[in-house]
Regions:
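Sec-dependent bacterial lipoprotein signal peptides
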Residues: 1-24
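Bacterial Sec signal peptide processing site at the extreme N-terminus
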Residues: 18-42
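Catalytic cores and adjacent binding grooves of peptidoglycan-active enzymes
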Residues: 25, 29, 144, 151-193
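Second-shell loop/turn segments in exported
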Residues: 31-32, 91-101, 141, 168-177
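Stable alpha-helical elements in mature extracytoplasmic
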Residues: 38, 42, 98, 102, ...
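Active-site acidic/histidine clusters and adjacent loop/turn architecture
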Residues: 45-126
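A mature extracytoplasmic/lumenal domain signature
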Residues: 80-82, 127-131, 157-159, 170-172
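Active-site-adjacent substructure of cysteine-protease-like catalytic cores
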Residues: 116-150
């Protein structure tokens, strides 16, 4: 039970941290209103920019419309970032703006921090929640989570090329000093996206 609460707390912390990657906004209820127009505009601008390209690691899926305001016009199944150099396991269902932000974050923050603190590169990100029509923190009676629009990814762990495995729950709270420093550095880097 304690481990489950710790993983939930870690997921919440990482979701809040990754929300900074795309400047999440707004909430509301699932079955009222329409998706805010800026969401589609951000998606269209991202696609038009060419920041995210279809590949063996990024595959466009069929549109998700609903229930209610939930959904994405162009969901992407992402199994790798940074040109496939960093696996995403299991593959994440997210939108173009978050995919582009994650690619930038991997290159500008994640890899430099891994090299600095461990002398190795990150080769895999373990995610525990991507697209899902739900409320924030799993509360379906509160504001809608950015997961409901493909704008959030909960990360549980990182695997390095040297075989080291760093979990958010253990590293953030009471892990070795360099694991904590690594996680704090990549958290700060996410805030710059």
């Amino acid at each position: 039970m304690g481990a489950r609460i710790a993983y939930l707390a870690a997921g919440i912390a990482v979701a809040a941290w990754l929300a900074a990657l795309f400047g999440c906004a707004g909430g509301g209820t699932f079955n009222s209103g329409e998706r805010a127009p800026w969401r589609q505009q951000a998606e269209d601008e991202c696609v038009a920019s060419g920041a995210v390209q279809a590949s063996a690691y990024v595959v466009q899926m069929t549109p998700i419309d609903g229930p209610g305001v939930c959904g994405l016009e162009r969901p992407l199944k992402v199994s790798g970032l940074s040109g496939g150099a960093v696996a995403v396991s299991p593959p994440a269902l997210i939108g173009c703006p978050l995919t582009a932000a994650l690619d930038r974050w991997v290159d500008a923050s994640l890899q430099p921090a891994a090299k600095r603190y461990f002398g190795s590169r990150v080769v895999e990100i373990t995610q525990i929640a991507s697209y899902g029509c739900r409320g924030r923190n799993g509360n379906n009676f509160g504001k809608i989570s950015e997961h409901a629009f493909g704008n959030a990814l909960d990360i549980a762990a990182f695997r390095l090329a040297n075989g080291q495995h760093i979990t958010v729950v253990n590293g953030w709270w009471g892990g070795p000093p360099r694991e904590r420093a690594f996680l704090q550095a990549i958290f700060a880097g996410a805030c710059n996206e």
